Amino acid sequence: MDTGAKLKKGAGERKGGGPKKKPVSRSVKAGLQFPVGRIGRFLKKGRYAQRVGSGAPVYLAAVLEYLAAEVLELAGNAARDNKKNRIIPRHVLLAVRNDEELGKLLAGVTIAHGGVLPNINPVLLPKKAEKAAAAATKEPKSPAKATKSPKKA
């Protein structure tokens, strides 16, 4: 009678007889911060395909995490360049638009409260070369103007 109770395995008892192990998430197994399980759920729920492989959410989470880290790194640099400690949408826009590859990836994306890149058409700028050439051909200023003469004489 006692032997029948020993053969039965409960939820707390494992095959080896040891205690139950703590569950480890797929994000931890992959060494990621982004949620692999949630991304897998979104892939299934979104009906992008009939079936979703077990490696697909892990790969997608890794790609998304890399892109987020890249954008945040560049936005942090832009914030530091502007002597700010907090990243704002303007810094994100400057980071994305000044990077060639990210700019190409996010070409059709509008970033709210990002503004625009500072850009002045060179045609509209005053011509420095002409000013410098004109100043060189003009007579140098008279020394009388350069030195102050006493007004009382």
From Swiss-Prot:
UniProt-annotated stretches for the region Disordered: 1-27, 131-153
Presence of keyword Magnesium: no
Keyword ATP-binding: no
Protein name: Histone H2A
Notes on the domains: Contains one SPKK motif which may interact with the minor groove of A/T-rich DNA sites. Phosphorylation of this motif may regulate DNA binding. This motif is reiterated in both termini of histone H1 and in the N-terminus of sea urchin histones H2B, but its presence in the C-terminus seems to be unique to plant H2A.
Alphabetic keyword roster: Chromosome, DNA-binding, Nucleosome core, Nucleus
Free-text function comment from the UniProt entry: Core component of nucleosome. Nucleosomes wrap and compact DNA into chromatin, limiting DNA accessibility to the cellular machineries which require DNA as a template. Histones thereby play a central role in transcription regulation, DNA repair, DNA replication and chromosomal stability. DNA accessibility is regulated via a complex set of post-translational modifications of histones, also called histone code, and nucleosome remodeling.
